[in-house]
Amino acid sequence: MNFQTISINLTEGKILVFETGKIARQANGAVLVRSGETCVFASACAVDLDDKVDFLPLRVDYQEKFSSTGKTLGGFIKREGRPSEKEILVSRLIDRSLRPSFPYRLMQDVQVLSYVWSYDGQVLPDPLAICAASAALAISDIPQSNIVAGVRIGCIDNQWVINPTKTELASSTLDLVLAGTENAILMIEGHCDFFTEEQVLDAIEFGHKHIVTICKRLQLWQEEVGKSKNLSAVYPLPAEVLTAVKECAQDKFTELFNIKDKKVHAATAHEIEENILEKLQREDDDLFSSFNIKAACKTLKSDTMRALIRDREIRADGRSLTTVRPITIETSYLPRTHGSCLFTRGETQTLAVCTLGSEAMAQRYEDLNGEGLSKFYLQYFFPPFSVGEVGRIGSPGRREIGHGKLAEKALSHALPDSATFPYTIRIESNITESNGSSSMASVCGGCLALMDAGVPISSPIAGIAMGLILDDQGAIILSDISGLEDHLGDMDFKIAGSGKGITAFQMDIKVEGITPAIMKKALSQAKQGCNDILNIMNEALSAPKADLSQYAPRIETMQIKPTKIASVIGPGGKQIRQIIEETGVQIDVNDLGVVSISASSASAINKAKEIIEGLVGEVEVGKTYRGRVTSVVAFGAFVEVLPGKEGLCHISECSRQRIENISDVVKEGDIIDVKLLSINEKGQLKLSHKATLE
């Protein structure tokens, strides 16, 4: 293929340039996207599977090259290795945007790789990566039902901003990443500062207009330079297999949905499937293979659940369409933690724990924008026992990182600022049972743990996951979906917020056709569900506790001049280590001169503050100081009034009586009171002990 390029103008100064035919020409598809001086590359490759599977083995990896900003990784290892949390989150954004666009039962191993090769510090690469990956698939021979595009939306001074720059995003009250096709929304991820449902919908509609622009142009580009799609690896479910399974077990699948218990339901479903396989599976028959029969069972199970919901408005666990599962709450569940809550909603449960600490406890990270730290972070743990399984224990998976970050963003908008509450806050959400909506349980449990710890949040935050049944007869919205409804339904739309508005949201779908009208209904129904949950939370804990836990450290901050930071730290950190050893406190100093002092007792903090004030204090004429005599000479004594600041107390100012020998009055090492009389043009201090005796 020869070099090909197109430009798409989103708005003034924000242009996307797509290039192909120059780099990675052996890949099925490869595209470089430029915007400003940020360049993101994506490739798409696929190979046929040796064994058929009932899922799409799509692998998406996104990597930010430090060379893109003219940097090299710190430390001994200079090569990019294990993906960072941010890279994992962007990989998930790309994956969730693309996955719905692949045809059902595509038997190919598909890999999409995306690299940031140039970053100008302003044009953010996330939406470019979605567009680059979609364009690479579009011009490849890998089957794809529709072209996808992604954009980011910000809100500055109540005005929507398309693909905001890093500077613009810093002042935005909304951070929304949106992906979709020309006709539908496929993926949503964002957080905002207590937006109304109408504001969220307006932002989505604004973003989708730009998605349509990109998709239409990419469609023309695909027709110009794209390869013919290879459909040989798509295996539709044979109608005769589905018919045979229906005749064999329709009644049994209907009876299955009378079972409410998750484990009993799963065991019964497995037994039904095994009986069907025994009856219908034929050796050396590709049509009635185990692969096709199991797929038909899943389809029939889904169809049965949908029919029951549509015809009877009754769900698998017996709830109505809008009912939230029963909730129980126990705060202060763990006695020695700073704050804790056991939150149970149906068969989903989290033990949330809040830990308070100094800045030393903050989460440090390094990315293309440099080094940074987070003073609030939520970590989500999903052990295998939560679903009654045996599995690996180790570093967190992509799902755990994604769920934790969503809950973290939801709660972050209710937190006090550092000046009001100078603590680093860590929440861990330990999922101990799971049957759907564990990330939203983490929001509820995490909020209650914050309140139990005495963190003065602005308002309680709750979360709920909404589901969807979509067919030719219309759309049905489900509140607080279970794991089964997530698995067999068409949408997982998570919304978190308070009575003031929405703080975070995330949507994944399995079908196209999510319209603004459906989203409006889902948001309205979610608001009612969140309010119901907030009322229950309010009964358990109506406000943050007035006092911190007795086991939490005490933290106070003080402001010093940035020019005085060196005085506190000392050469090689000698001075600050001395203060820590002497008082037993923990001290953190930032570049702005904010000193954070933490300790288990107020007396230790006060002692450290006194030392620091002495180190950075400025002497004042007319003020009395208690100082140490550093040396004695014939004409007087030199007295240190503040660390590193000493002045001369002349022999005539040492006593109210005339003295011949100053050693008769003071000796080196004595502690005496002196008054600062004046400071000459050279900065020398004139002191008087006599003035303190009057």
Curated annotation (Swiss-Prot):
Which reactions are catalysed by this chain?
RNA(n+1) + phosphate = RNA(n) + a ribonucleoside 5'-diphosphate
This protein's major location comes to: cytoplasm
Q: Does the keyword Transferase apply?
A: yes
Which cysteines link up through disulfide bonds?
none
User: What are its GO biological-process terms?
Assistant: mRNA catabolic process; RNA processing
Q: Which residue intervals define the domain S1 motif in the entry?
A: 622-690
- Intracellular or extracellular location(s): Cytoplasm
MF terms in GO: 3'-5'-RNA exonuclease activity; magnesium ion binding; polyribonucleotide nucleotidyltransferase activity; RNA binding
GO CC terms on record? cytosol
Xref: CDD domains: KH-I_PNPase, RNase_PH_PNPase_2, S1_PNPase
**Domain of life, per lineage:** Bacteria
Q: What are the KH domain coordinates in residue numbering?
A: 553-612
Please verify whether the record's keywords include Nucleotidyltransferase. yes
Binding residues annotated for Mg(2+), in chain numbering: 486, 492
Task: Provide the top EC class.
Answer: transferase
Similarity section: Belongs to the polyribonucleotide nucleotidyltransferase family.
Q: Under which name does UniProt file this protein?
A: Polyribonucleotide nucleotidyltransferase
Instruction: Identify the species of origin.
Output: Chlamydia pneumoniae
| Gene name of this polypeptide | pnp
